Amino acid sequence: MSEITTLQPSLLWKWFDQICAIPHPSHYEDTLANFIVNWAKEKHFFVERDEVGNVLIRKPATKGMENHTPVVLQAHLDMVPQANEGNPHDFTKDPIQPYIDGEWVKARGTTLGSDNGIGLASTLAVLESNDLAHPPLEVLLTMTEETGMDGAKGLRHNWLQSEILINTDTEEIGEIYIGCAGGINANFEIPVQYETNTFEHSAQITLKGLRGGHSGGDIHTGRANAIKVLARVLAKLSQNQPHFALSEIRGGSIRNAIPREAAAVLAFNGDVKTIESAVENLAVVLKEELAIAEPNFTLFVESAEKAPTVFTAQSTQTVINALNVLPNGVIRNSDVVKNVVESSLSVGVLKTEGNVVKSTILVRSLIESGKYYVTEMLSSLAILANAKVEFSAPYPGWQPVNDSTILDVTRKHYAEVLGEQPVVKVIHAGLECGLLKEHYPNIEMISVGPTIRNAHSPDEKVEIATVQTYWDLLTRVLADIPAK
């Protein structure tokens, strides 16, 4: 056990510590799911897994609440695996190492997994508790949310018995989410041709130290995208420096996180100091430009092993130009929902694989037409760059409903717990609620949770005091669910 088990509420933190001890990155959450299933069987709860691996647990109502409206608490089982450069952490084998840092819980050198591990822990703590009042209760734990919402998409029909769903994936205390953006993946592939490397020198340009973050929730903050900044650097170098050729370009590691690092390996003739000086000058400009948003930004040149082949001159320029004009970030703010992004995209991963440079992009929008406007932009660019773009794994947004029983009850108890009215809002991030609503169109839904910062990055942290507030809210709401 780690030191976080000394925190309150103790049952929730005990469960989160256990969750951290069992590796559960996306696509590797079966061990955690099976652990929970076996625990539920030992407690003699109804427990079942569906065809895609989702877990459903049922607990009878406490005495006197048997005829109250049944509720399902929902969380996802997987976490985003991100580690600091040089950290050998294997997310499929190594436990997360949480620790207390003042008012926050963090992890040592990796993502913490408080998204959605705290929510998951809260559902299990409710199940284990013997002194909480609640109606007939279900807990739904979904698979592989972070890389495509596979569990929510494949959820068994007519499985849930509840009429109210509380999603636990919100990352701001004092807020109730009632709607979210939909999304679609885009794979953008630029074909490249190679030639024998006859250049004298090779070097790697590396960009690192960016903050990264959630590609939906943080897309409006002005944080730099490492892939886009690197493309800008290469475009500037190609204008002013002697001819060079790329042999590799890469950046980012996961589609739904803003890339923190990127690098390009290039070959060139002439004085090495010419490239070094040019990059140093660009670094000065960029550091000044990004001083507030990215205080730890670094850009540097280092020697690299000579590759046997390099991109042709035409392929080098095509890759640089296509990446430099590839849209990224906020496309449009919502006219309907104040201070919320309507449509965006984030270039999440860049790889050189054989004869293509491949970019993985996540498009988000509150409205379907906005989502497909962005995909049309990418299709047009693909034509201009002689590239190929394919779209996959679309998921719907969650359309807000401003009047529901669960919203009224949650507002009431949030005001009591906080001493002020909560903020009811729609977010520019993907929650599973839109997909769950397709399976169960008549179910009422809200989403709540504690304050989490820098999700999807190794700087992720959860605010300790807000976990207690979230727990107080959740338990009060469950005790006040009305009769049918």
UniProtKB/Swiss-Prot annotation:
SUPFAM superfamilies: Zn-dependent exopeptidases (SSF53187)
Residues that, per the record, bind Zn(2+) 1: 115, 146, 456
Record bears the keyword Protease: yes
The record's free-text note on cofactor binding: Binds 2 Zn(2+) ions per subunit. Can also use Co(2+).
Residues of the signal peptide: none
Residues annotated as catalytic: 78, 145 (proton acceptor)
Keyword terms, alphabetized: Cobalt, Dipeptidase, Hydrolase, Metal-binding, Metalloprotease, Protease, Zinc
Chemical reaction(s) catalysed: Hydrolysis of dipeptides, preferentially hydrophobic dipeptides including prolyl amino acids
Cofactor: Zn(2+); Co(2+)
Top class in the EC scheme: hydrolase
The enzyme's E.C. designation: 3.4.13.18
GO function term, MF aspect, one: metallodipeptidase activity
Alphabetical GO biological process terms: proteolysis
Binding site for Zn(2+) 2: 76, 115, 169
Record's GO cellular component terms: cytosol
Pfam families noted in UniProt: M20_dimer, Peptidase_M20
Role: Dipeptidase with broad substrate specificity.
NCBIfam families linked to this entry: aa-his-dipept
Similarity section: Belongs to the peptidase M20C family.
Designated name of the protein: Cytosol non-specific dipeptidase
